[in-house]
UniProtKB/Swiss-Prot annotation:
One of its GO terms (biological process) is siderophore biosynthetic process. Residues 200-819 are annotated as: Bisucaberin synthase. Signal peptide: none annotated. In the N-terminal section; belongs to the IucB family. In the C-terminal section; belongs to the IucA/IucC family. This is Bisucaberin biosynthesis protein C. It comes from Aliivibrio salmonicida (strain LFI1238) (Vibrio salmonicida (strain LFI1238)).
Amino acid sequence: MTDFTAKAQCSFTDRYAPKKDQLINISEFEFRNYNEDTDFSVINQWLSQSYSSYWGMNELTEDQRNLELKNTAHKFGLVGLKRGKILFYTELYHPAKDEIGEHYPVQEGDCGMHLIIAPVDIPEHRLSQNVITAISSLILEHLPFTRLVVEPDIQNEKVHRLNHLIGIEYSQIVPLNSKTAKLGFATKSQFLQSQGKVSSMKNSSKNPSLSLATSHLTTEYWHKANQHLIAKMITELSHEQIITPIKLDDASNAQAASWCITFNSDTGTSEYLFRARQYQLDHLFVEPQSITCTKDDKNQPLDAVSFILSCRHLLEISDALLPTYLEEITSTLYSKAYKLMHQNKTSAQLANASYQEIEAAMTEGHPVFIANNGRIGFDMLDHVEFSPESGQSLNLQWIAVLREKTSFAVIESLSYDRLIFDELGQSQLNEFNQQLSMQGLEPSHYYLMPIHPWQWREKISRIFAADIANQYVVPLGTTEDKYQAQQSIRTFFNLSSPEKCYVKTALSILNMGFMRGLSPYYMSRTPAINTFIANLIETDPYFAKKQFFVLKEVAAIGYHHSYYEQATRTDNPYKKMLSSLWRESPYAPDQHGNVLVNKQQKLLTMASLLHVDDQGKSLISALMADSPLSDHNWLKQYMDLYLQPLLHSFFAYDLVFMPHGENLILVLEDNSPIKIIMKDIGEEVAILNGEKTLPNDMNCLAVDLEDPMKLNYILLDIFDCIFRFIAPLLEQQTQVSESDFWEIVADSVKDYQQEHPQFDAKYQRYDLYCSSFARTCLNRIQLNNNQQMIDLEDREKNLRFAEDIANPLALFAKTHRII
């Protein structure tokens, strides 16, 4: 690898440029630093000729060109030599310091590139291709960059063809001051694939891609990741009454108090000191930077895995499951360090970012679960390629599956043919059908379906080998559409055509207590369930009044593997490996041409509200600051849109969703909330009335629970899992105190109940102002069984509880309760 001077605090040029007299040999070329004294006269002649017009320097004077080529802190030039003669010049630059950086979220390790090749008297076969390939190799294999960025003129077809040959994938057209450009990217993986080097990427211990996949594992980022996760462990394990911190002083909530936790074990006594504020719902808001650790009175570095081992006797986790849990903890730390390194936008900047920019910038994951980024099954390169925080665009793999072995279902207003035509287009559909025909197969005997590239590579190609050999499953390749992984990791948003469907795929990795497969049996019911719920929402004028909508899962497909169907009658991950579904996009027009989101509005998942940047500033406070509404009115409007429709679902229909942050999309205008869109309906909705008459194919929705547990769908899922985290952020960073927050919640409940007196009996039966409610402990559930936390057929079986928790709304019972 090239010797370069790389310090994080150095300028782009100091960090990445080769040393002064260094020669870098790649293929038939030598690279060295641009020398103004000896090289400018040569390159100046090139830039004055018409063939170099896309550089925009034809009309400049010699002095102006000389100034443009000078190295700066943010760009440097290299010349390429062949047999000692200068053949080309390339400029490498920092996109964040260039105009192009205003048009996309620049990532750590991005490198922009410009190129000009000397005019030649005698054309040389593939010269331009060989030059651009060598430059790409320099950037992605020899220098420590992770992504090549290009922005050629939209009319420069020659360069577009060359870029395609090095794996560049264009994402968008952008208007620049001097041109209209195509913005494109190539990662190390994409470049190697374009050169046919994929097989060596994962196997060569000397390959730079391996170090790039661990470049975030520095002492600084690892310390911060452990600091963050231990703070979360203290918060959540104390909330679930697994550990009991001791308060050392009597500071008020305006200032954090000092706390202590002591663990005694066979290996010694560990003590953690920290500062934290105490909030409602037994929530400790820990200051991560305040945490210190000693073991037997000796200072220790912060280590989240050691924290777990120190208190393992309190966790009630089996010896068999503990190693897997520790792996999940380590993977979560790995992911956090990656996010810390690549977190390049403040919350204030994200408040004005696009939907997918925000989605890729999220750093926490589920706010309650400690081991929430396990992703067991992904290696380090998979993490870079497929994780939501990498923000990578990718192509989904498509296959054909024999219809007689496949379950396919679609909503009544759609058909398979219409769906596939809308998603693929006629040209791509013809290409796939032609592939089948050329293999002697009848296209009408097959369904086409998208799958996750990792799932194809790691699972389907091997476990379904017999089906592939027998042409029950036929690989077809990829389409041109680019997708981005969402926070839920197995769901993809179409970047190329945002109006097309989300695609949710089976992904056989273990993440947060589940193997993330999709059951083909459940796929067969999914569109009908979505239609049933959507009809209920759409025909009730209250939901329309509150601007509460759902995104339907309009079609679903699942392949049945005959071996595993015979091997086990019970639920099993092997039976959930090959399924996908299509979900409506919020940008898709309805049958009348109307869309949920117009150009003045923007989207973000509700999980984004809890995002905190590296300066400790939350996104929800940044949105409030940028909104014309007061902080209190912003929050009231949010409760009107979010809480009240969920109350109506519960009291009017016994209907509950899983309303956590990733399942809801918040629509904003002027950074004020105006709509709520619920998604992920199929697997995470229930009717809490076992006696309620439902259509035959809807019986799976009925859940028979005791009344207190029904109420937990609001008190736990909304209050404890969402509001518990929002309230402290608002108290610390806005004009909304914690008491203000819960009063606004109580007012919202009261307003709803007064507007709907017909449910008075239910308000008394399900009392939202009750003194306390069941403390359902999600981390205890994961510790009990981190392979499958919840049995969807029996949701209560694996639940774990501690002492009941005080309800913040009880303070308002006398003034707000409907009597």
